[in-house]
Amino acid sequence: MRKNKIDIISLGCSKNLVDSEHLIRQFQANGYSVEHNPSRVDGEIVVVNTCGFIRDAQEESIDMILELGRAKKEGKIKKLFVMGCLAERFMAQLIDELPEVDKFYGKFNWKEMLNDLGKSYKEDLSSERYLTTPKHYAYLKISEGCNRFCAFCAIPLITGRHKSVPMDTLLNEVKYLVSQGVKEFNVIAQDLSSYGLDLYGKMMLPELIDQMAQIEGVEWIRLHYAYPTQFPYDILPVMAKHDNVCKYLDIALQHSSDKVLNNMQRHITKAETIDLIKRIRKEVPGIHIRTTLMVGFPGEGEEEFNDLVDFVEEMRFERMGAFAYSEEEGTFAAKHFDDIIPEDVKADRLDKIMEIQEEISNEIQSKKVGNVYKVIIDSVDEVYYSGRTEWDSPEVDPEVLIPVENSKLEIGNFYQVEITDATPFELFGKVVG
């Protein structure tokens, strides 16, 4: 056990990661040595930033807490703190069932942790973070919470109503991160589309991205988690105008069937969804759309699933993920629908939709062979440098693999790369020029 050292373990999404990065910076400013996601826990204090979104994530968080609880009983750590979405959602229950935890903090009161340790939260560092990602890219969380209340989703139950971060705060954070070497900003929120409504009375995502794009040193801006209903169309000319705004949009559509969309409380129709996609592609030529779909939601019969299959084949999304519905405690769907679709049927539907997407992805990727693209290098191993194009977000999208042999590239730098081969999930290339 190392005195005056704190280990922070982040579970779940990139939004959680940003919270951990802000907390690490505060701990450092208060004199602590901090390690993020250590291979071996040896700090006298351990903080677990939990995820509570879906059942698998909840179980992962609980397993981690139990493991660290055993380490505490063995005297390997002195204090165990738990924060984040799981703690926010199930605070009372966790306090009763996990007495080995010294204190639970929710999603928004983690600043109290500093006070409990006899330290103070430093407001002048509110825009500063310790980057846990490679130093050339960062996630920028522009809001917290969601006002949409989709039937299947527990996020509003955890994070509450939509709360935007003031634009000045975000722009200062971007400038700080640029000064630390960040070139690529992945803009994230539960609902990008609603940014600014609560603070400024109107959707301000276009203004925010326009101002970010003008900051010297910002090479790439990528948008994650837009909402299709009340989509801020003014963002499209901003994307088309600025070369450093990636032609990429992550927008979760969930389904195509009007019946299922209505059950999901998405407040959009299939026809409106198709019009949205067509307009995005028309106004931002070359854009790659990433979406997420759900199979097995209550009301999805064979007709509705076949509608989804036809939709995927027609829309030909450049990037797509999918998952099978699982009932979440407290949601509208859990209260009002019976989850009666057998799990094996859900699994078969998921496999089918992803097989179709794999074929589409293979065709789209193959068309890149012979072309030259701007690629940022993320990492290297004994065989390949791993990089990404503007259409590829960290962790979730295809990589560009460049042989180490006869190449000497710098991590975090951009290169012109000719694509020589492709699979649905990878591109292979060589540096040119």
Kindly give the residue locations of the regions a language model identified.
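Glycine-centered loop/turn positions within well-structured domains
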Residues: 111, 148, 193, 258-259, ...
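Conserved SAM/AdoMet-binding glycine-rich loop
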Residues: 79-84, 89, 94, 179-303, ...
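Terminal RNA-binding accessory module
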Residues: 333-433
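Short acidic, glycine/proline-rich loop/turn micro-motifs
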Residues: 261-264, 332-336
